[in-house]
Amino acid sequence: MSLDINQIALHQLIKRDEQNLELVLRDSLLEPTATVVEMVAELHRVYSAKNKAYGLFNEESELAQALRLQRQGEEDFLAFSRAATGRLRDELTKYPFADGGIVLFCHYRYLAVEYLLVAVLNNLSSMRVNENLDINPTHYLDINHADIVARIDLTEWETNPESTRYLTFLKGRVGRKVADFFMDFLGASEGLNAKAQNRGLLQAVDDFTAEAQLDKAERQNVRRQVYSYCNERLQAGEEIELESLSKELSCVSEVSFSEFTAEKGYELEESFPADRSTLRQLTKYAGSGGGLTINFDAMLLGERIFWDPATDTLTIKGTPPNLRDQLQRRTSGGK
């Protein structure tokens, strides 16, 4: 992995009681040793693989103002990180659920792009077996479950300040209030809505195949083709590009897919991040509620699975063997 650390600082917030978070600040930057580089590379890998929301700094963002001064050389990175950790502590004390953690600020370069990564990591206790096969206590950073993380694409921020996607952050699993406090600390608001872009793409694909008057099998083949392209981009950590997707679909219609989306007003960006959960709808139907969960391949609709919209009834012909076995045992006396 071609990752180069420019500067990295660690500080700590320790929760002493419900009202107080103790601030522990380092007096020097971390040296980018092999271990430190490995840790940042792992954090970069884990973060890149997760679904993220996109944002931009508000005009009054204190963090953005301080970062701008630091980038201009008016403040060193350590002082910037110490002051920012203090602001984070002040923001956290507003919330009764707030916990402490290791606060990381890392300025690094990956594939010719400069980033600032900000994270709050849990420092967990565990056990290790030493060379004498004795068990000793140890501590480790819980990188795999890190959920309070944001990353600023410094290159994008400085070269394209009107962008709505230079700031990314994790959102959802940690709960709305946690996401709120971190956004308040960053002084940021949501920008590009990746889910909305992906939903628009799915609708455009369906409309595109309908206008081309494709039959059911042909439409499903196009959906699988789009899914394959988008999934490859997702796995590679790259964005969906309308022009390259249009080339993939060049045989569907005389009108290119990119021209179609522009003419019909879908308001899709030239490129946008792939959203895994939304893209699954290209090949599967899934839903849950009221104690019922259903998930099946899209190609089965109209063949083994039939939906009557008038009565909102789903009819399944041929149940999976393991489900059929459970039903038979339960209805024959519960044996």
From Swiss-Prot:
Record has Electron transport as a keyword: no
A Pfam cross-reference name: NA37
UniProt keyword annotations, A-Z: Cytoplasm
GO cellular component terms listed in the entry, alphabetical order: bacterial nucleoid; cytoplasm
Cysteines joined through disulfide linkages: none
InterPro entries (UniProt xref): Nucleoid_associated_NdpA (IPR007358)
Compartment(s): Cytoplasm, Nucleoid
Chief localization: cytoplasm
Any GO MF annotation of the entry: single-stranded RNA binding
NCBIfam families according to UniProt: PRK00378.1
Family: Belongs to the YejK family.
Name of this chain's protein: Nucleoid-associated protein YejK
Organism: Salmonella arizonae (strain ATCC BAA-731 / CDC346-86 / RSK2980)
